[in-house]
Amino acid sequence: MGVPQHRPAASSEVESAAPASPRRRARGGWLRRWAEALVVALLVVTFVGTTVGIEGNSMAPSLLDGERALVPRYETWAARLGLRSWSSGDVVYFRAPGDTPRTLLERFTGGPFVIKRVVASGGQTVDVRAGRILVDGVPQPEAYLNGLRLANVRLTSVLVPEGHLFVLGDDRSPLGSRDSRAFGPVPADTIQGRAAWVVWPPVRRDADGGWHVNLRPVP
């Protein structure tokens, strides 16, 4: 009677993998959390809201150099889907006209962007008389200008094409803003969004040397 012999397991049998080291597990968890945070951030700035920086004072006194304004991105998507349209008084930002000088980075990102105020839309006529903007012959109140007028600016009657917007900077001084007076009406589908709230800097020094809260809606 033979004696049973114990033979080693066949080499084809798969051995249990060694458990990952604590350091490797920690690294994997860290990378996963960063990836999830990046995806959430991209979704927020694409569909919820982002900010746009103000360079120069062409929109003074409403927006000042160095400030940042909140842009509700859901409004942009609503406009692209035909659920809303940009209207007179909206402060919008868009890609600068094609003749604007661009750096290599701006060519890659689609910039530079400019921010102006809508004063008329497609089918409307814009005039300047006695320093006042008239749309279809009706003077516009423009309370956000604090009494400033286009006294030194002449503008012949302009009929805004359908699907376009006539935009102006709030700084109406000579050479204060390069806007539709220089490059004409802009296509409405180039609008990237509406500036709704000034969110940076949160506080600002006033002319008397004191500090005041700078968070405010864009007029």
Which residues are covered by each model-predicted region?
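Extended hydrophobic leader/signal-anchor segments used for secretion and membrane insertion
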Residues: M1-P219
